[in-house]
Structures are given as C-alpha cells and as structure tokens.
Amino acid sequence: MATLTISIIVVFVLGYALIATESLTKVNKAAIALLMLVGCWTLYMVDPMQYLQLMHPDYTGGAAGMVEKVTGIIQEHLGDTATTLFFLMGAMTIVEIVDQNGGFNWVRKVMKTKSKRALLWRIAILTFFLSAILDNLTTSIVMIMILRKLVTDHKDRMVYASLVIIAANSGGAFSPIGDVTTIMLWNKGLITAAGVIAEIFIPSVVSMVIPALILQTMLKGELVMPEASAQQNAAVSDFTEGQRKAVFWLGVGGLIFVPIFKSITHLPPFVGILLVLGVLWTATEIFYRGLHRGQDAEGTQKRVTKLLSRVDMSTILFFLGILMAVSCLAEIGVLTALGQGLNVVFDGNHYLVTGIIGVLSSIVDNVPLVAGCMGMYPVAAAGDMAVDGVFWQLLAYCAGVGGSMLIIGSAAGVVVMGLEKITFGWYMKHISWIAFVGYLAGIISYWFIRTFLYAI
C-alpha cells in the first residue's frame, strides 16, 4: 500500500478517534469532521494520478486534464452529499415547524402513559413501522420531538432515544424505501419489494425486540409528566386546534408523501422534502396572516423565518465532513479493497462477509460500502448471488441494522446525537453491546428461516 494512501487512512482514523473522544477533548465533532475532509482531500491532491488510474481506468486526459477531472470527481461527491444535507435541513425544519406550532400535542396525548416501560414499547413499535414508510433519518427527528413532549428526565430520554436509533434502523432494513441502502439495492434490481419485506421483516423485528427487552430493565417506575402542559398549550394558542392538526398532517403526511413523489417523478428525495417545506411554510404564513398580528413579536416567533435559526448547523457540518471524508476513502480504493479482502478471507461465506460489512457500516458510511459490494459482486442467475438471494438480502439487513452499533454509524444516530447531546462514549458503553446482540439475533433468525423453514 502506498505511503500516501496510508497517510490518508491515518488522518481518517485519527479524526475518527477524536470524534469518539469528544466528551474528553471537549472539541466539537463537527470541527474535527471538517478537518478530516480537508486533510484527506489535500493529501489526495499530492498525487491524484495514481488514484485516477486505479479508480477511473477510462480516464485518458493525462496530466493536463488531471485537475479538471479531480474537480469533477469532488463536485460529484459533493452533489451526492448535498442531497443528504438538504434532505436533513428540510426534514429538521419541517419537524421544527410542526413542533413549535403545536402539531405534536395530540400525538403526545395518544402516546401518554405513566409507565416508563409501556412508553418504551409504544415508542419502539411506532418508530419501527414509521421508519419503513419514511426514512430512518426523518423518523428519528419526529420521534425525538415527540419524546421531548413526554419525557423530562434527560437520562431516561437518552435510553428512549437510543432505542429510537435501533428501531429506526431495524424498521428501515426490511422496507425497499426505508433506508438509502435498500433503495440502492432495490433500484439496481438486486432485491424486490416483496422479497425483502417477506424475508427480512422477521429478522428486523428480532433486531429491535431483543434490544428493547434489555433496555426496559434500565427503566423503572413511572414517568414524571411535564407540569408545564398548560403553559405549552398557551404558547401555541396562536393556532386553533384545527390549524394545529392541519400543520401536523401537512408536515408528517408530507414526509410520508416524499417516497411517493420520488417514485412518480424520479427526482431525488430532497426535492420532495423541499416541496413539503414550501407547502407547509405557505400554509403557516396564511394562518399567521389571518391572526392580524402584523409585526407583533409574540405572533412572529414561530414563523418559519424565525425557526430557521433553530436548525442545528453543527450537525449539518458534521454530516458534510464525514460523508466527504468517506468519499475520499472510496476514491483511493480502500473500501473496494476491503470488500474484496473479506470475500477472500472468509472464502465466500456470505453470512460472515455481510456480517462483517454490517459491523464496518457502524464505523464508516454504509452507502459506499454497499456501493462497493454492488460493484464487486455480479448478479448470478441462481444461488446466493441471484436477485433476492441470501447475499443481497443479508446485505440490506446488515448494512441497515449494523449502523446501530455505534452512534455515528447511521444517519439516525448522528441526528439523535446532535438533538439529544448523547456522547459517543456513553452510547458505546451502555448501548453498543445491546445493539450488537440484536444484530446477531436477527442474522441467526434469518439463517434459521432460510435453513429450516424454507427447506420444508
């Protein structure tokens, strides 16, 4: 391996270590992620020709067109990253609008219970199925906002939020539109909607239920319900009950509509999110105009122009840094080589290969890992590598559920980390092993079903 490649890997690993020890260093993870981005790509530019020849063998421009080619590559990765960032910003803004204007108040009434454990199961089930319809990122944002209405104790809320991460990733794994990796495999024709739902549903349920059973032992007693409910209702009294419900259904219903919009128009999901944001923004402006408050400060605090300042930009910048740093690893061939090496070491055992890929997906972004697998392994007419074969279905499960093992291993984890201020160390100490147990149990259940039930 070239010295330059090793240097890029060292920068990534060092940055990852600093992110993991944020609670000790007190340096914001977004700052480290941005330095990782710049460091990796700067080293890449020391000698980009070797990587162009490796990853883009069709390039024939020579040294003269090298800079232009690399610029195009970076812009392509930035474009892919930007779609995620705009989706995230749009989803966070939509949920903030719904929350601040009282849209979640009635949901709180439905979910309300005094039992901590009863709430845990309600949260787990709702998150699991909502994630199959929405994506795990949007689902996590919605559920955290609901949790804030129900749970005042931050320690308890960290436990619930951790289960939200696990349930969101598990729910997204069995749905063709629930996770970006299943969308990739589905669009490529490697899995079918009916196949992945039928065969991955039970393993996904197992990977959620077992962690929930363990996590409920961390919750005892009854919830202390927020005393400020009357004040909260007063705070959102700008809108009538009907208007609040309209805001809720425009927001959450719009999020559910995004996959439908994508399937109809074939436009990226962030376009659908921006459509929903535009419609919801317009509706709230019309509602506020009807209040005749003009420039009165009290009546304008919850308008979208004010709420935009509440979007957590550090989370956005963290995503930017991580995704662009990982894209550099993809461009130097590390991820592809890693996948090929796994196949050789484990002699084509697809349970082990996909299992390891799932563990790796908790460390690096699962999108380039899955993309690398799609490029490495050809589709066969029959057997494990056929459409809906063991390899592709396990890849969908492992890449999705495996991200729960570390809090920065999935989009859901990263956004919950930012919203609830959960540290990497706390999650790794208290939750990682629980997520790993559920992950393994899901794989075992899949093996049992394929080996014994399908053999009947």
Where do the language-model regions lie?
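Interfacial loop-to-helix junctions that mark the boundaries of transmembrane helices
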Residues: 1-4, 24-27, 55-59, 67-84, ...
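Juxtamembrane and boundary regions of transmembrane helices in multi-pass small-molecule transporters
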Residues: 4-7, 153-154, 158, 174-175, ...
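Hydrophobic mid-bilayer segments of alpha-helices in multi-pass membrane transport proteins
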Residues: 6-15, 26-62, 81-93, 244-254, ...
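Hydrophobic alpha-helical transmembrane segments
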Residues: 9, 34-35, 85, 120-125, ...
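Membrane-interfacial helix-loop connectors
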Residues: 40-51, 78-79, 130-167, 171, ...
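Transmembrane alpha-helix boundary signature
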Residues: 43-76, 92-109, 129-141, 328, ...
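Transmembrane helical segments that form the transport core of multi-pass membrane transport proteins
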Residues: 60, 79, 101, 108-110, ...
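Alpha-helical transmembrane segments
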Residues: 79-89, 195-213, 265-278, 352, ...
